[in-house]
């Protein structure tokens, strides 16, 4: 038993000998040991081929990215070695296709091919990835940015969401978190075309409480009034268009109402619908100076009908008597 225990330890280092053998046999070019070393180098070269030299430095003479092949000039022997894109082991991660740049220094293994020497396991000096050809397409790492720019296109939605922010611009007691959320909306208002559309529409809805002199429905208190004079100055061009049309409609209506008052006794019912219409039309700011005139006329109109109404029953009583 003691003899068997002594014989077993020397048996362990025996398998280590073949592992060291390939390293020594590679430079000698042994056929049997070289095949085991080519196991890793053969697949990119496209088959089991003899290795002529390893870790050879050379400069790329030219490389066609479209066809996927080129030639490398060895620095030691000044020979041209054929290179295929499949032989490139470490490609530039930013490039789609495997390629080598013209005039680039490359480290590779020389292998025997069908028509001559070929390169295999092509990498940069020291095993670094290859730089690649400048004509090779880069990977589109910037695809995400145009997708981020997409949301600002919906300016109308942004303005609808930011209307509440404009109403409260004058409020001083605002937490910092809300103020930061409103800043991007302000930045998106810079394009002029998108500024004109919402502001041109807003005065129609925001003005009625001011011109109709109804303060109960006014939601915009301090901040809304501060923003209105600015909008008036910015959009003066829109006013004359609205001034021309509605005043022409007023005059015939007022004249017709005066004639009806003289000829008809029950005029109060007919005057109520036009008053509502006028109030709707007065929503525009342009008609502020014109508001007192129709109001005086309305007061005289409302004062006249009761006199006629009182005369009418007196006449009826006289006829009855």
UniProtKB/Swiss-Prot annotation:
Keywords carried by this UniProt record: Cytoplasm, DNA-binding, mRNA processing, mRNA splicing, Nucleus, Repressor, RNA-binding, Secreted, Transcription, Transcription regulation
Region (C5-methylcytosine binding): 62-67
CDD domains in the record: CSP_CDS
Similarity-based family: Belongs to the YBX1 family.
Keyword RNA-binding: yes
Annotated segments matching region Interaction with ss-DNA: 15-68
Places the protein is found: Cytoplasm; Nucleus; Cytoplasmic granule; Secreted
Encoding gene, per UniProt annotation: YBX1
Residue ranges of domain CSD in the record: 58-122
Name recorded for this polypeptide: Y-box-binding protein 1
Basic and acidic residues compositional bias, start-end: 289-302
UniProt GO MF annotations: C5-methylcytidine-containing RNA reader activity; DNA binding; miRNA binding; nucleic acid binding; RNA binding
Composition bias type Low complexity, residue spans: 36-46, 191-203
């Amino acid at each position: 038993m003691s003899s068997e225990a002594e014989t077993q330890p020397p048996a362990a280092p025996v398998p280590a000998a073949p592992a060291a053998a390939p390293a020594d046999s590679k430079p000698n070019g042994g056929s049997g040991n070289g095949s085991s070393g080519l196991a890793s180098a053969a697949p990119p070269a496209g088959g089991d081929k003899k290795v002529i030299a390893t870790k050879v430095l050379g400069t790329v003479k030219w490389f066609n990215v479209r066809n996927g092949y080129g030639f490398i000039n060895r620095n030691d022997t000044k020979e041209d070695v054929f290179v295929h894109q499949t032989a490139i082991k470490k490609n530039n991660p930013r490039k789609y296709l495997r390629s080598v740049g013209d005039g680039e220094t490359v480290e590779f293994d020389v292998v025997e091919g069908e028509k001559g020497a070929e390169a295999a396991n092509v990498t940069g000096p020291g095993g670094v990835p290859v730089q690649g050809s400048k004509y090779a397409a880069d990977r589109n790492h910037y695809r995400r940015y145009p997708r981020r720019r997409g949301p600002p296109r919906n300016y109308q939605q942004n303005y609808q969401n930011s209307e509440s922010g404009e109403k409260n611009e004058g409020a001083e007691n605002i937490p910092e978190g809300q103020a930061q959320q409103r800043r991007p909306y302000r930045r998106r208002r810079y394009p002029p075309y998108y500024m004109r559309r919402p502001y041109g529409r807003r005065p129609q809805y925001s003005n009625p409480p001011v011109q109709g002199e109804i303060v109960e429905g006014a939601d915009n208190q301090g901040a809304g009034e501060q923003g209105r004079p600015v909008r008036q100055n910015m959009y003066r061009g829109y006013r004359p268009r609205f001034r021309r049309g509605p005043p022409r409609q007023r005059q015939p209506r007022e004249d017709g109402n005066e004639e009806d008052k003289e000829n008809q006794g029950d005029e109060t019912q007919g005057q109520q619908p036009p008053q509502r219409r006028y109030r709707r039309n007065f929503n525009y700011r342009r008609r502020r100076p014109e508001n007192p005139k129709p109001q005086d006329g309305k007061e005289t109109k409302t004062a006249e009908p009761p006199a006629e109404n009182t005369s009418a029953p007196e006449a009826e009583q006289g006829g009855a008597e």
